[in-house]
Amino acid sequence: MALLRGVFVVAAKRTPFGAYGGLLKDFTATDLSEFAAKAALSAGKVSPETVDSVIMGNVLQSSSDAIYLARHVGLRVGIPKETPALTINRLCGSGFQSIVNGCQEICVKEAEVVLCGGTESMSQAPYCVRNVRFGTKLGSDIKLEDSLWVSLTDQHVQLPMAMTAENLAVKHKISREECDKYALQSQQRWKAANDAGYFNDEMAPIEVKTKKGKQTMQVDEHARPQTTLEQLQKLPPVFKKDGTVTAGNASGVADGAGAVIIASEDAVKKHNFTPLARIVGYFVSGCDPSIMGIGPVPAISGALKKAGLSLKDMDLVEVNEAFAPQYLAVERSLDLDISKTNVNGGAIALGHPLGGSGSRITAHLVHELRRRGGKYAVGSACIGGGQGIAVIIQSTA
């Protein structure tokens, strides 16, 4: 076994994902985490007093209270003030990383029950002004910086994230047509799963205000199930002439959060929790920043090797859909079985709120694996700057 102790998922919930500037735009990342965490505590019948640690992933730190995020989430959901909290940032892998950190705390017996999660409000990413605190003269031309837009460029290699995906398209000979067809598949799979109610077990509905008054939001807002291939083919490439990445085949800018509660085997017995899945293992790897999207390849390979398993053992595989060519490069490199990979659509359809996606993917795999009667699943994400992260779970159903 890859972990030193048995670690189990006892609850896994996520909010619906809101479109950029959509129904969730007025909720901070802290608010969104609170919704997910409350739902997870309730679903797992976990008393806040039993939680030993709170670990939340968040990337953009977009709200004024963001530096307190994990701490505020813990206090808001009733976890005792004596219980410590930690906010972490491994970019797009932050939701997964919260679970990794939680496993580590449990394995070294620093904690028995950990509230993990990831969250992002990309709609609330502020405009900011740099280098004006000192020496700014009267009448200076103040330049506003879009913190969301600039964050999507890796300054170390001077490449926007989309261009790292274009690099993979060239390297793996991936065509624009293949990218659009994959994007359409993501939308169609999301629609089929949503219509069938496959997201119900993971979803934590939110009450939102609209022009028509208050309503309950329980469906991902970003998805465009009516999309056609013809519409996708008409969209212009965003970053490169004759490129492959368009607004239609890239992950959606979104708002949302997820929460995953993990517990040691001892805690499961002591508190009579119902284990939904076991955390089998995890792996984090670095890769070339100019093709950061290939990160899931070494991450999945490393996690499988540590666990003594193979891709053939996996009943479900999730690779976060940052960009269609990025996903397709991973699919080709690992020779993934498309019948069990991203089976209910992914971030191209429902959006990618940076810190929230790892928690969303984990929650989905936990419930989908049980629904299908499968045994093993692996979830993964590429990470800006050139990294990959993967977590393997085993159903306990």
Curated annotation (Swiss-Prot):
Name of encoding gene: ACAA2
Q: Which CDD domains match?
A: thiolase
Q: What's a single GO BP term from this record?
A: cellular response to hypoxia
> Pfam families under this entry?
Thiolase_C, Thiolase_N
Indicate the residues annotated as transit peptide: 1-16
Q: Which InterPro entries match?
A: Thiolase (IPR002155), Thiolase-like (IPR016039), Thiolase_acyl_enz_int_AS (IPR020615), Thiolase_AS (IPR020610), Thiolase_C (IPR020617), Thiolase_CS (IPR020613), Thiolase_N (IPR020616)
Give a yes or no for keyword Ribonucleoprotein in this entry: no
Q: Does Nucleotide-binding count among this protein's keywords?
A: no
NCBIfam families named in the record: AcCoA-C-Actrans
Task: Identify residues that carry N6-acetyllysine.
Answer: K25, K137, K143, K171, K191, K209, K234, K241, K269, K270, K305, K312, K340, K375
Species the sequence originates in: Homo sapiens (Human)
Q: What does this protein do?
A: In the production of energy from fats, this is one of the enzymes that catalyzes the last step of the mitochondrial beta-oxidation pathway, an aerobic process breaking down fatty acids into acetyl-CoA. Using free coenzyme A/CoA, catalyzes the thiolytic cleavage of medium- to long-chain unbranched 3-oxoacyl-CoAs into acetyl-CoA and a fatty acyl-CoA shortened by two carbon atoms. Also catalyzes the condensation of two acetyl-CoA molecules into acetoacetyl-CoA and could be involved in the production of ketone bodies. Also displays hydrolase activity on various fatty acyl-CoAs.
> Active-site positions, per UniProt?
C92 (acyl-thioester intermediate), C382 (proton donor/acceptor)
Give site residues, Increases nucleophilicity of active site Cys. H352
Where found? Mitochondrion
The name under which this protein is listed is 3-ketoacyl-CoA thiolase, mitochondrial
Keywords recorded for this protein, A-Z: Acetylation, Acyltransferase, Fatty acid metabolism, Hydrolase, Lipid metabolism, Mitochondrion, Phosphoprotein, Transferase, Transit peptide
